[in-house]
Structures are given as C-alpha cells and as structure tokens.
Amino acid sequence: MESSLTFLLLPVGFPGEVLVTLARRAREAMPVPSLWLASTDPLEPPIEAYSWERMQFDAEKVNEHIHSVLYDYVREGIRIIGVVDADGYIPGFNFVFGLASTALGVATVYTRRLKTGGNGLYTERLLKEVLHEAGHLLGLDHCSNRECVMSFSRSVEEVDRKAPLFCSSCKAKLVLKYGSRGQ
C-alpha cells in the first residue's frame, strides 16, 4: 500500500481562492488517507495548446505543460490536478470536462461547461470532476454505476446526476490499494 497520497489543486488561468474550499471537500470525500493542497498562485495556460479554430485548449498539451512546469512536485509523488478556467478537448471528442494523464501524474478539469446554473451548483460540479480525475490518477476506470463519481459524463446533466462520492465498488478498489481513512 502507498503510504501517502498528496494532491495539489492548481488554478490555471484564474485566481485560485475557490480551490482552498474545494481541497477540503475533496479530502473529506476521498475514502483513502490523502492530503489535499490548493495553490492560489495561478499558472497561465500554454498558448500553444489553444486551438483558435475550436476556441478550446487541447487537454493533452495542457497536461504536458503542467507536468513540465511542476515536474519536481510530480517526481516527489504529488498528483497535480489543474483547474482550467476554459473549455478543453481531446482529439475525437467535442469537449471534455477533464482529462487524467496517469503516466504524468497530472489531470485537468475544464470549468467552462460546468458554470451554468448558480454558484453552488458550479462548485458541486467542480468537486465531482476533481474527484473523478483524482480517481483516474489513482488507477480507477470509468464506472457503470451512473451515480458514482467515476461514471463517464457526456453532458452537464450527467454530471449533475452523479454523486460527489465513490460507489462501494470503486471505494473498495481504492481502499484495497491505498488503505482506509480509519487506519
């Protein structure tokens, strides 16, 4: 079992004060022992990752950029989740809410499509997508349980439908690999 899981929430393209509360809520929702840190110092997204045709960022390129800038953190085992104040895509998809690059130890969540509705709804959606990408960084695949945070979301309505929690099956996989918070 891995002894310490550390996540750093990184604002990309906006001031990150909202991430402090998000880090606390993510730690509370994570079924395994983990430390969640939040940077309030934003990283600018790489302009070379921006598609002017699509008006979106290439999520793979953004992940690679974060990895190169914060390599020393990743080398120490810290998993980075960039929260990008923009829209993102990967080839073959019109958009993505997030992308985990497990080999890099980096994931990103894209906020543009999560911002419809009130601020409370946005914060809840953001929490769900951060937990979803954290699950991928910890080795979880998509889950067929539509209420599980690891369920794949094709629309913001599907994000709203799932809970900000791991289902019993996904939770068991994490606890088996990383131990439970009660240990």
Curated annotation (Swiss-Prot):
Cofactor: binding comment: Binds 2 Zn(2+) ions per subunit. One is catalytic, whereas the other seems to have a structural role.
Enzyme Commission (EC) number: 3.4.-.-
The keyword Transcription regulation is annotated on this UniProt entry: no
UniProt-annotated binding residues for Zn(2+) 1: 132, 136, 142
Keywords, alphabetical: Hydrolase, Metal-binding, Metalloprotease, Protease, Zinc
InterPro entries: MetalloPept_cat_dom_sf, Pept_M54_archaemetzincn, Pept_M54_archaemetzncn_arc/bac
The protein's name: Archaemetzincin
